[in-house]
Amino acid sequence: MAKKVQAYVKLQVAAGMANPSPPVGPALGQQGVNIMEFCKAFNAKTDSIEKGLPIPVVITVYSDRSFTFVTKTPPAAVLLKKAAGIKSGSGKPNKDKVGKVTRAQVREIAETKAADMTGSDVEAMTRSIEGTARSMGLVVED
């Protein structure tokens, strides 16, 4: 018989830096999950990813307090900021441009995010990432 799902917990945790402090501790503590077990498993799984990069994770908690989790790719905005070499996006994206990214960088980000995005092809996903870049105040160059 399949285990009964008790809850889904969605978090963004820095790669390789999961610890029992907020937001991980309170979110999993409410569900009765062994927090240290999750932290060790998450840190082991994200070992190959650049430390500190925020990784979305969906944790499935079962009624017997066991859990499984799925990691996703980092948010497009984080990858764009990293590619442009900026700390944050523009407060007025249509007026103040804060950086530049090339179309090749945008395509590379789209290919990285392909597993998580619901686009029909890489071109559609690239256009979606370009829109995110523009809304952050980045200029997309050829």
From Swiss-Prot:
PROSITE patterns: RIBOSOMAL_L11. One of its GO terms (molecular function) is structural constituent of ribosome. GO terms for biological process: translation. HAMAP family: Ribosomal_uL11. CDD domains: Ribosomal_L11. Keywords: Methylation, Ribonucleoprotein, Ribosomal protein, RNA-binding, rRNA-binding. The gene is rplK. Pfam families: Ribosomal_L11, Ribosomal_L11_N. SUPFAM superfamilies: Ribosomal L11/L12e N-terminal domain, Ribosomal protein L11, C-terminal domain. One or more lysine residues are methylated. Forms part of the ribosomal stalk which helps the ribosome interact with GTP-bound translation factors. Part of the ribosomal stalk of the 50S ribosomal subunit. Interacts with L10 and the large rRNA to form the base of the stalk. L10 forms an elongated spine to which L12 dimers bind in a sequential fashion forming a multimeric L10(L12)X complex. This is Large ribosomal subunit protein uL11.
